[in-house]
């Protein structure tokens, strides 16, 4: 991992990469991403993360196998996707970068087979601890995002959106999921597929990450990737709702104006202080720069140039710091 030191130490204070106008130092290209591997350990007894004023943190459930995403059903039950990346197809070539990433992920506790299931957690007495933990839906394919629309529960697998019938209070679903729409798969550099339904349930929105850092495998590998896709759940038809978002993960609807917001993981290998991850309101049809530019129209020199695309790039709303891997996003309505 000595190659990771080629970028040198960070030159900016941590808060310089946050806010509506983050500092953007000159890029310093490196061979592999900036990494600092934290050991995967639990919280000791009596300890917990420190929350912002007015909020608290406590353990809701434990003993889960690689939990990655949560979804709260209207009756208060919580679904958790126990999941990991799918096995890559044998046709996918894997080089030094992939080898390093596998080692990094394994050390961080992520080098395990995917459990491929959704587990239900229920806190019936409302004491902040789930007393029921039970398998809810199994036999999936690296599931991640979940969304309820009407009487159907939609799940974003690594390669498709699927659906099952749902009735309030169910603790297990045994029917075979119905395929609603295919999703970009293949190499699956970013395999997680986040999912939200429109407030009226008539459309689904899927966050699909890029298949690379900055398009190094060719743009043929990036069709309908680095984008939010809009899907008609009745027909399975899909279109690109917004693009140029390297890895759009957490999504939520603003209760104030109804706009869709997203948290985005940006690119690597141009220094510790670049590029800031961000959250932003999503402009329908908007293009957010990837891979040709970042934070609006700051040109990334690594991909083949495309000035016309750079000129279209929308500047995001709020930076969240470089390499923070910002994932979840939720509006508080309390």
Predicted region positions:
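Residue position within the beta-strands of beta-propeller blades
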Residues: 79-81, 155-156, 205-207, 261-264
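Conserved beta-strand position repeated once per blade in WD40 beta-propeller domains
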Residues: 66-69, 145, 194, 250, ...
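Short loop/turn segments immediately following beta-strands, especially the blade-tip
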Residues: 121-126, 164-172, 282-289
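Asp-box/WD-like beta-propeller blade repeats and closely related beta-sheet repeat scaffolds
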Residues: 129-152, 157-199, 210-213
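Beta-propeller domain segments
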Residues: 7-51, 87-109, 113-115, 192, ...
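C-terminal motif of bacterial Sec signal peptides marking the signal peptidase cleavage site
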Residues: 3-5
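Residue-level detector of Asp-centered blade-edge/turn motifs that repeat once per structural unit
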Residues: 73-76, 148-151, 197-201, 254-257, ...
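Surface loop/turn motifs at the tips and blade-to-blade linkers of beta-strand repeat domains
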Residues: 59-64, 134-141, 180-187, 240-245, ...
């Amino acid at each position: 991992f000595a190659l990771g030191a080629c970028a040198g130490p960070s030159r900016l204070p941590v808060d310089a990469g946050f806010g509506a106008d983050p500092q953007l130092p000159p890029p310093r290209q490196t061979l592999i991403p900036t990494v600092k591997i934290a050991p995967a350990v639990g919280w000791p007894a009596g300890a917990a993360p420190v929350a912002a004023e007015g909020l608290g943190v406590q353990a809701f459930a434990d003993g889960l196998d690689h939990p990655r995403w949560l979804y709260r059903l209207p009756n208060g039950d919580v679904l958790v996707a126990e999941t990991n990346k799918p096995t890559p197809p044998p046709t996918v070539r894997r080089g030094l970068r992939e080898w390093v990433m596998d080692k990094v992920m394994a050390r961080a506790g992520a080098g395990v087979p995917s459990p491929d299931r959704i587990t239900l957690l229920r806190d019936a007495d409302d004491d902040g601890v789930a007393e029921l933990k039970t398998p809810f839906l199994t036999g999936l394919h690296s599931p991640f995002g979940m969304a309820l629309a009407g009487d159907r529960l939609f799940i974003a697998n690594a390669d498709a959106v699927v659906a099952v019938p749902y009735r309030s209070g169910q603790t297990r679903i045994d029917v075979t999921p119905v395929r609603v729409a295919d999703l970009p798969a293949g190499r699956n550099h970013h395999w997680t597929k986040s999912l939200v339904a429109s407030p009226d349930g008539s459309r689904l929105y899927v966050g699909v990450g890029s298949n690379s850092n900055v398009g190094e495998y060719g743009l043929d590998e990036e069709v309908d990737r680095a984008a939010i896709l809009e899907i008609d759940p009745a027909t399975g038809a899909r279109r690109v709702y917004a693009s140029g978002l390297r890895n759009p993960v957490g999504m939520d609807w603003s209760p104030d104006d109804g706009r869709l917001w997203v948290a985005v993981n940006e690119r690597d290998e141009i220094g510790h202080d670049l590029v800031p991850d961000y959250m932003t309101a999503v402009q329908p049809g908007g293009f957010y720069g990837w891979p040709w530019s970042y934070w609006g129209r700051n040109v990334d020199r690594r991909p083949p140039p495309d000035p016309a695309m750079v000129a279209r790039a929308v500047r995001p709303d709020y930076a969240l710091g470089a390499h923070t891997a910002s994932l979840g996003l939720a509006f508080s309505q309390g």
